[in-house]
């Protein structure tokens, strides 16, 4: 059986403008803006939470099944994911829309002008999980990551109705969801992933307390930035893990996705919550050291050396055979 990852699939188009936006935008003409910036650099990165998580699971030697919606322009991206161990056979290809993309221009003052085109992502709501699970002969876990909100709700209901164990990872979509929708996404999840801000937002919108959340999920996993992560199970002591020291801090984008992949790999391998969280933190550290969410390389030997330095040889011995395949 496999881990199924549902979530967004997108590309990031990042441009750099050497001037200052404020020198080109006239305050007295804000009601009729028409400006163009000659940019100096363009970087295109593969992204989307679902694709990032699946990519990192593939790097750890698992064979995740990615479920999401893309456009006909996905072919090259799909080949990249396949080459890194991701099963993309369940990805829906839109006949009318392009793959979602984020376009952002940053000026010399670090001001940004950005746009997000959801595109084919809106068709994620048309994907049915049952035929995919039937073809696979079952699923160990379905991760429901940030995506088209209607698609997230559909997939959660389907998991609940058909008895598929699922992990809730609403992430940035919490901001646009109502409390009752959030409750529906979370109730009965085997795992709930949030960061500290998202956890506060979830509790405010649902009216739940920490205890209420723990009563509704099997395991609560909360990332805390540089402070690491806490893992809670109802009635058990909290597990806290700090991240390894990074060699450089290049770009935090995609760090949370990498953590989720590492943690879920640990779940799939049957290791403890602490060990799973350590795997997630180690993988997240690799991502923060590179620009782009899928630009890092996971060399098993180096990965395990750093893991052992951070968490000790006994901890490393428990996961080494899995990481090295």
Where are the regions that the model predicts?
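Gly/Ala-rich phosphate-binding loop of Rossmann-like dinucleotide-binding domains
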Residues: 58, 160, 268
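Conserved phosphate/ATP/ADP-binding segment of small-molecule kinases
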Residues: 160-165, 171-240, 248
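Conserved phosphate-binding/catalytic loop of the ribokinase/pfkB sugar-kinase fold
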Residues: 89-94, 102-141, 145-146
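Cofactor-binding loop segments of dinucleotide-utilizing enzymes, especially the Rossmann-like FAD-
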Residues: 7-8, 68-72, 93, 106-108, ...
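Glycine-rich phosphate/adenosyl-contacting loop at the front of the ribokinase-like
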Residues: 1-65, 76, 248, 314-325
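A glycine-rich beta-to-alpha transition motif near the start of alpha/beta enzyme domains, typified by
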Residues: 63-90
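Conserved phosphate-binding/catalytic region of the ribokinase-like
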Residues: 207-325
